[in-house]
Amino acid sequence: MSDTRKKEIIMATLELAANKGLGNVSMNMIADKVGIKKPSLYNHFKSKDELVEEMYQFLREEAKKNAHIGPIDYTSLFQGKTALDVLRLTVGGYFHMNQQEHMFNFYKVIYSERSLSPMAAKIVVEETEKMINATKQLFYAMQVHQLLHFNDPDMTALSFAMTVHGLMDYTFDQTNAGNEASNKLDDYLKWFCKENEVK
């Protein structure tokens, strides 16, 4: 399948899901939106679940490129920075990646359907696990470079990732409700660095 056709199918699916809800979108509707026959759609994707999973992977990679997120060289990332600088940079990058228009719209659909759709729940779990694993790698590197100290880096990474995830949702909800976003995320990062400083 050409990248152009793949993107066209993914964007059509995203638009339909945003308007009708993922559970209400059929392969037939997607084919009609793209202007192809339903059997042709099955030449590209075996099922709607496969299409949604592929959409997640595609949009995530697109968002990473747009947010300029690539492989991390911890030595250069840490050079001349405090622990707080590093956490602000990495959390800010993740936040920016998820605010990319297509990724943001995808998450709105997935989050609204995760209690009803096993596929949506699977994607939320997958993204959360990616966030936890990336945080573990970051914390091990920060400990090796003596930027922070953790008694249990794995549990600290889990706690940190879930707290940041929750605070990002909270910030989104504040903004969506028409309120000014608070500084709770930055306050948390400051507190976290103080609690885990190298002594």
Question: How should these model regions be labeled?
Answer:
Residues L22, F45, V109-L116:
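Short helix-capping/turn signature of helix-turn-helix
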Residues E8, L16-F58:
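Helix-turn-helix
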Residues L89, G93, Q137-V144, M162-K199:
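C-terminal peripheral helix-coil segments that are non-catalytic and often amphipathic
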Residues E54, I69-Q100, T156-F160, S182:
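Hydrophobic alpha-helical connector segments
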Residues K122-T128, V144-A161:
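All-alpha amphipathic helical-bundle segments outside canonical DNA-binding/catalytic cores
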Residues K64, D85, M97-Y111, P118-V144:
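Amphipathic alpha-helical packing segments from all-alpha helical-bundle domains
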Residues T4-R5, I9-A12:
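N-terminal positioning helix adjacent to the helix-turn-helix/winged-helix DNA-binding module
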Residues R5, K48, M55, L59-A63, ...:
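Hydrophobic/aromatic residues within well-ordered alpha-helical segments
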